[in-house]
From Swiss-Prot:
NCBIfam families: DTMP_kinase
Pfam families: Thymidylate_kin
The UniProt record lists the keyword Nucleotide-binding: yes
Record lineage: Bacteria, Pseudomonadati, Chlorobiota, Chlorobiia, Chlorobiales
Full protein name: Thymidylate kinase
Biological processes annotated in GO: dTDP biosynthetic process; dTTP biosynthetic process; dUDP biosynthetic process
Record PROSITE patterns: THYMIDYLATE_KINASE
Coiled coil: none
Assigned keywords, A-Z: ATP-binding, Kinase, Nucleotide biosynthesis, Nucleotide-binding, Transferase
EC class name: transferase
Superkingdom to which the source organism belongs: Bacteria
């Protein structure tokens, strides 16, 4: 089973990825949790390039770096894990590219769709959980976690996090459009709910999916 989590930075994806991993492992399943970009030595180096605040990267360059990282992760890690009947949980997948580089940066959506297909080797998650949060709430959450004064730009944030509120508003709007186009795959969850409430909604959907595919 291939499961992905989506949402703007600060929505709580990483927390829910680990909660779901533990839940599935407790039920005797082999589970691999991965993040994008990253997950292989090359992909982790690409991650550093993408997030370093001092790097001035063009939108197309950013797109292709994300795609290169994904291609490495899919072919070296995800596909072998799925072939061994492991569950794979992803903290971001190709929907992030559509939302961030497409709606956020304004790149052509048809071009992105083709690059996504190539980089992902046409893999599509069985289910995607989109944790919905406004950029304002996400920013407040991030600075609260770091015990820092609220600011729209900060050296405490990485290059992507420092893209600004208008950028993240476009990204969020993009996620909603993607969700509307893929209602059978994408489940939208209010990220302002407590972590335990979000987890309950997620495992309810996962249990239903496992029953359906058993």
């Amino acid at each position: 089973m291939l499961i992905s989590f989506e949402g703007i930075d600060g929505a709580g994806k990483s927390t829910q990825v680990m909660k779901l991993k533990r839940y599935l492992q407790e039920r005797g399943r082999e589970v691999l949790a991965l993040r994008e970009p990253g997950g292989t030595p090359v992909a982790e180096e690409i991650r550093e390039l993408l997030l370093e605040r001092r790097n001035d990267i063009t939108p197309v360059g950013e797109l292709l770096l994300f795609a290169a990282s994904r291609a490495e992760l899919v072919q070296q890690v995800i596909q072998p894990a799925l072939e061994n009947d492991s569950d794979v949980i992803l903290d971001r997948f190709f929907d992030s590219t559509t939302a961030y580089q497409g709606y956020g940066r304004g790149l052509d959506l048809d071009m992105l769709a083709e690059i996504n297909r190539i980089a992902s080797c046409r893999l599509v998650p069985d289910v995607t959980f989109y944790l919905d949060l406004t950029p304002e709430d996400a920013l407040m959450r991030k600075f609260s976690e770091k015990s820092l004064p609220l600011a729209f730009e900060s050296e405490e944030l990485d290059r992507m996090e420092n893209s600004g509120l208008d950028f993240y508003r476009r990204v969020r709007e993009g996620y909603h459009k993607i969700g509307g186009e893929n209602p059978n795959r994408i489940i939208i969850i209010d990220a302002l709910l407590s972590p335990s409430e979000i987890h309950r909604k997620i495992i309810s959907s996962i249990d239903a999916l496992c029953t359906k595919t058993a």
